[in-house]
């Protein structure tokens, strides 16, 4: 680039920044001619409005519908159940937690696919002497699953822990086996080898997966199922109670929890925090730059209501803050109302509930445990944390 051209570029860039700083328009294009439709978003939203769902909930024949819909969801997401449990390729620990020395933390690196290892961290109390109920923890789109056991790795982690993000540690204190699964794209599973990465941590994975007929949500659900395969195998060092395998997920972890529970009936209770809303409402109100929801053809077959209906009759709680800017509480209510006929078909209408929390998009430990005790695990009765 010659000097005069470079100067023109710098000048126009500086003027553009100045206009932006002063709150002035920066769109260089003229007003769109009257009567024209130039928005790709409006085009796609219009085509979605009247699209019939080929696998919409059919409560009149719920068993047949769940069988067919679960198979179709697996195909759409690229979810494939493993035929054998994963193997341990490395172990880190055990080490006592500084804030809870009677709880040991051990990370197992599980070979879940030929070129994919999954960090699964177990938290176990020293008094564990019988098959343990499982609290499987999926963090949100934050720094990683280490929040589950109360560790900080980046500055903002202190704020997250101050409002109760260490839900797996809290569960372990209450008698569960805490199982912290690192999600694809975050923490130790963040992409570090792709030569030229995009700014968002998961968009490359989502697009590459879509090109292979897979999806980020499918990969996450497969990792959850592989973790359960291992927990139920003889390789797991702690016996578990297969009738009390539960999942807690927040934000992107909550979305993954919903899909995992819809696809894997071994999950016997799910609490999805800050993550329940109809996908059509999400794409109608905001961009999806991380590719988390990229499941090609989803709206031809499903809506979020149907995903929740696949969880029936197993307990489900959708919890959200009344001021959540992504997953507002009224959106939780609509999705759960849409799934309620499935629960009624099983005479289990009391097993699904929308729970409102007082603020915005964040963890809610107290409200989560109240709903957990009431809906997810009636056998949970320990009100006081213990080490």
Put a short name on every predicted segment.
Residues 238-250:
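Alpha/beta-hydrolase fold nucleophile elbow
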């Amino acid at each position: 680039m010659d000097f005069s051209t470079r100067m023109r570029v710098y000048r126009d860039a500086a003027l553009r920044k100045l206009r932006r700083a002063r709150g002035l328009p920066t769109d260089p294009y003229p007003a769109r001619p009257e009567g024209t439709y130039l928005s790709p978003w409006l085009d796609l939203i219009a085509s979605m409005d009247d699209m019939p769902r080929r696998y919409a909930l059919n409560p009149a024949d719920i068993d047949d519908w769940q069988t067919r819909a679960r198979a179709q969801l697996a195909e759409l997401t690229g979810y494939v159940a493993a035929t054998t449990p994963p193997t341990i390729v490395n172990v880190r620990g055990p080490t006592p937690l500084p804030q809870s020395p009677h709880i040991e933390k051990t990370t197992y690196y599980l070979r879940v696919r030929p070129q994919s290892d999954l960090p699964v961290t177990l938290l176990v109390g020293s008094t564990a002497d019988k098959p343990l109920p499982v609290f499987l923890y999926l963090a949100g789109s934050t720094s990683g699953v280490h929040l589950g056991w109360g560790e900080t790795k980046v500055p903002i982690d202190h704020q997250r822990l101050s409002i109760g993000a260490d839900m797996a540690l809290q569960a372990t204190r209450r008698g569960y086996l805490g199982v912290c699964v690192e999600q694809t794209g975050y923490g130790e599973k963040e992409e570090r080898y792709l030569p030229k990465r995009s700014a968002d941590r998961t968009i490359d994975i989502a697009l590459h997966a879509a090109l292979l007929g897979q999806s980020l949500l499918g990969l996450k659900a497969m990792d959850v199922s592989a973790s359960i395969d291992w927990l139920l195998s003889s390789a797991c060092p702690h016996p578990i109670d297969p009738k009390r395998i539960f999942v807690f997920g927040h934000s992107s972890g909550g979305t993954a929890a919903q899909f995992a529970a819809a696809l894997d009936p071994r999950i016997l209770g799910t609490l999805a925090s800050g993550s329940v809303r109809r996908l059509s409402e999400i794409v109608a109100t905001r961009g999806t730059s991380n590719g988390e929801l990229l499941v090609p053809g989803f709206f031809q077959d499903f809506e979020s209501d149907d995903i929740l209906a696949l969880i029936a009759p197993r307990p489900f709680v959708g919890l959200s803050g009344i001021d959540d800017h992504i997953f507002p509480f009224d959106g939780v209510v609509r999705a759960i109302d849409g799934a309620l006929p499935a629960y009624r078909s099983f005479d289990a209408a009391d097993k699904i509930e929308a729970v409102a929390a007082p603020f915005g998009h964040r963890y809610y430990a107290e409200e989560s445990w109240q709903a957990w005790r009431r809906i997810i695990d009636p056998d949970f009765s320990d009100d006081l944390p213990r080490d």
